[in-house]
């Protein structure tokens, strides 16, 4: 692709979602979001009009499935972070709440069962391609960077039991290595 064409494609994709969906039909708003996601090179599913499921791949939390829902006036974002903690509830929730004040675009929330999500809402009139890129980058960063510490706080006993069970049976510990510092009895020796 030539530089002029790439710049033109970028400029066209950078128009706000609202501008590209001026008559505000669900189909046109969805088409604007589809164009934005494709411009960013992101794979997605579009299971219903205006709803896009994007898989964000991380290092600690291997996949963060993120919903982008184009509404009449706003773009909603929701990503599952983890289920409700088994233990140490106060420290677990304090850890997440302390992060909320430093976060852009999304924040940690709970559903009615206590499961934890990253959620946010932005006005469609101001959502550009760069905003979508930044918002998804934030979801990935917040999910990935906080995952191990949250699991240690809320699921430490279960992780230790799983570690011991795998060691006893000679099973792989590969996906538990992030927790070796506290789960491996020999690490403290």
Model features per residue range: what roles?
Residues 58, 111-137:
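Amphipathic, soluble alpha/beta structural segments
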Residues 151-189:
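Short, highly charged C-terminal tails/helix-capping segments
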Residues 1-5, 22-88:
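N-terminal catalytic cores of peptidoglycan-degrading enzymes
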Residues 78-119:
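Short, internal acidic amphipathic alpha-helical interface segments
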